[in-house]
Amino acid sequence: MDEIWERAVEAALDGQTDRLATRTLTLDGAVKCVQGRLPPPSVLEKFQNLQHLSVANIGVSSLEQFPRLGNLQKLILSDNRITVGLEFLVEAGLDSFCDLDLSNNRIQFVEDLAPLAELKLVSLDLYECPVTRLKDYRSRVFGLIKTLKYLDKTDAEGNERPESDDEDDEEDEEDEEEEEEGDEEDPGSGEIDGDERAEAPRMSNGHSERVDGVVDVDEDEESDAEDDESEQATGVNGTSYRANGFRLEAVNGEEVREDDGDDSESGEEEVGEDNDVVEVHEIEDSENEEDGVDDEEDDEEDEEEEEVDNADRGLGGSGSTSRLMNAGEIDGHEQGDDDEDGDGETGEDDQGVEDDGEFADEDDDVEEEDEESGEGYLVQPVSQVEDHDAVGNDIEPINEDNDPDEEEEVEDDLPIPDQSLASSSRPKRKRDDDDDGEDDDDDDEER
C-alpha cells in the first residue's frame, strides 16, 4: 500500500524532484483507501514547506496518523467518509492551519467539531454534511470556533467570502510566470512574418505605395481618355465613325476600310483619283456624336478650307469628285419613305463635273450649314466607274473658253449612277438641287 502512495505522489509532482520547493500537492482520487486510512506519515512529511494539500475523494474515514506539516495552511478533505477524529489534526501541530474543507462528509453533530476550536481556523466548509441540517447550525458553529470568519464560504451575515490575499498572490505569481515565458518566446527582434510583410507598403525613392488596390490618378485619367477615344471610334449598328465626325458605311456590299487619323486627307484624295462618286448624307447627331464633332470642329474647318483652295487651283478630277454634295438631313429609317420624292433628281447632280465657281459657292453654303448645325456627315463610296479610259483622271477643269459641244460630250460619257442611290435623297436636297439645275440651264443657254 505504501508503494501505491509513493507512485501516486511521484505522478502528482510531474517530474519535480525537490521536495522542499513543493508548495502544493494534489492527490484527489489518486488512491482508494481500502481501510479508510491516510498514507503513512513518512510519505507526506517529506514536504515540510507544503502549504496546500488536497486529498479529496480517496475514501478516507479516519484522520489518525495525520502527517506533521508545520507550514500547512489549507487542507481539502471533501468527498470522503469522515465522521469523527478531528482531534488528530490538532495533534499534528498545524500551527499555520487556517482553511479546512470537509464538504460532503458524514459529520452529523456540532459537538464533533469541538476539537477545531483549538486551531486558528478562519474558514470552514461543511457543505452537504448532515450537520448543516440542524437548527441554528450556523450560529452554533460560529459560537464554537471563535476565530472562524467564514462558514460554507459565507460570513456570519451571509456575505460571500472574497478571494483571500494568498490566493490573489498565487494567481499574480502564475500570471507573471506566464508573461515571462511569453517574453522569452517572443524576444521582439522586429522581424515581420510572411503575412505582415505582404501587407507592408513598399518603399521606393522615399515614396510608400500599397501594392494591392492603389491606382495612380494620372493612370486612371489616361485610361478614361483612352476609353473615350475607343468609344468614339467604335462602330454603331454596323457603321464606323471617323475622328472628324464622318461616318462611313459600306455601299453595294463593299467594305469601307477606315484609315488612321493622319491618313484621312490622303484617303479622300484617293477616292477622288479613282473617280468614285461619293455621296454624303447629313445624319442626326446623338449626344456622343455632338461631343466628337465639337472636339474636332477646328479640324473640319481646316480640311474644308483646304478643299476649297484645291478647287480654286483647278485640281481636275480629284478636285471635282472630292466635292461633298449636301443631300439634306437624313435618318436611316426615313430612306424608304423618300424614294418616290427623290426619283430622277440625282443623276445630273452626281456626275461630279461642274464649274469651279459653282463648286466654290456650293462649298461655302455647305460650310455655313455645318457650322450652324454642327452635324456630321455620312460618307459612302459608290461603285467605281466602269469605263476608266473614257473619263478616268483625264477630266480637266472646264474653262469658259471651252466649246459647249465638247462639254456636252464629256457629260454624256460619264456614267449615270444607279437609280437606287436616288432613293437616299431627302426633301431638303431636292430644293437645293432644283436651284442648282436652273442655274445650270441658264449657263448652257448663255454658252
UniProtKB/Swiss-Prot annotation:
Protein name: Acidic leucine-rich nuclear phosphoprotein 32-related protein
Matching Gene3D superfamilies: Ribonuclease Inhibitor
Pfam families found in the cross-reference section: LRR_9
UniProt family annotation: Belongs to the ANP32 family.
PANTHER family in UniProt: ACIDIC LEUCINE-RICH NUCLEAR PHOSPHOPROTEIN 32, ACIDIC LEUCINE-RICH NUCLEAR PHOSPHOPROTEIN 32 FAMILY MEMBER A
Organism: Arabidopsis thaliana (Mouse-ear cress)
Region annotation Disordered: where it falls in the sequence: 155-447
Ranges for the LRR repeats: 49-70, 71-90, 96-117
Presence of the UniProt keyword Mitochondrion in the record: no
Keyword flag Repeat: yes
Ranges of Polar residues composition bias in the record: 232-242
Classification via PROSITE patterns: LRR
